[in-house]
Amino acid sequence: RDIVLAMAASTTSGINNSRFINADYAPTADFDLLLKAALYAKEKGINIKAGNVLSSDEFYEDDPDFYKLWAKFGVLCVEMEAAGLYTIAAKFNVKALAILTISDSLVTGQKSNSIERETTFQDMIDIALNIA
């Protein structure tokens, strides 16, 4: 399973646009946590990707090709929490890093079953526990 370290989080949500009075806010990870996670993964031989992710209000979009525009701009995956996590972390001046394991692929259509979801996320957990 691919592991993604979310450097930043774009969003389809309007919450930050509302919060920042019609302006765009770019929520980002804490650099120290990101660096520690990347270095730990490299040391342990865990393959990771680091980059921008998309926080979407809808996990299952009506348009199966909606991700293609985001992918063209280098967005690595779609999830639902990173933009909110990073925005609140910035508001309260705390560190945050979203570490994600790809469970379902919009590109290939591959989906994890419930047993895989329970048993194949160990590398992500290992990274998180060792950088905290």
Locate the predicted segments by residue:
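Glycine-rich phosphate- or other oxyanion-binding loops that anchor nucleotides, phosphorylated ligands
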Residues: R1-A132
